[in-house]
């Protein structure tokens, strides 16, 4: 067919047919980009450990550069990086305060449950200092905190980042002292296996849904999770005291969360 004939044929098509053709072209292009993106996700996920703290990144991440983000944290956390890198430890101190410090490694939830089982009647508050870690363990710890009517706190110059705010959200009363460093970003359920692109996408979606559902059950404002989803894993969205109050991450003594029914 001559170019002029082809042009006439296109012009003679009705608008609906032209729109359908354009749609299928765009759909094909989108599918091609999706395959590329899924392959990149699969490669990235395969390289990540089973934690959302990546070993090649510092525990104290830079602030997100997204428009409207509050910027840098109030202070540098006081704990050395080597302390925060260690698997989470639990230390019961005076006043019924259980200090939870370090990375939320796989198995942290089981150790926490054992601690609560052994000393539950003495534990009134969990004080957090963690760069994050295993999402599944964070959710399990958060649920147990709520079930046992325990409060949570981030102390002055302590760090609660990545999946740590999930634990924080479980407290029946939640406080962040002046200069507490609280940050969120995208979380994922990493694996040592090499998933297919479809498996990587499915895992990311399932983890996202699981965290969103849990935060909703804990009565945390949806805006908090939106900030997390908008922030890449190598950055943090550092929350201001006003934002923590707005999203009900802190209760400020005026709003006490109702314990979950389980």
Model-inferred region functions:
Residues 42-79:
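Juxtamembrane proline-rich low-complexity "stalk" or linker regions positioned immediately after a signal peptide
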Residues 135-146:
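Membrane-embedded segments
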Residues 191-262:
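Charged, glycine-interspersed solvent-exposed loop segments at helix/strand-loop junctions
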Residues 137, 150-188:
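Glycine-rich beta-to-alpha active-site loop
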Residues 17-37:
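Hydrophobic membrane-insertion alpha-helices, especially the h-region
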Residues 1-16:
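N-terminal Lys/Arg-rich, disordered targeting/topogenic segments
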Residues 18, 49, 80-111:
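STAS-typified acidic loop motif
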Residues 121-135, 151-158:
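Short, glycine-/small-residue-enriched flexible loop/hinge segments at domain edges that mediate gating
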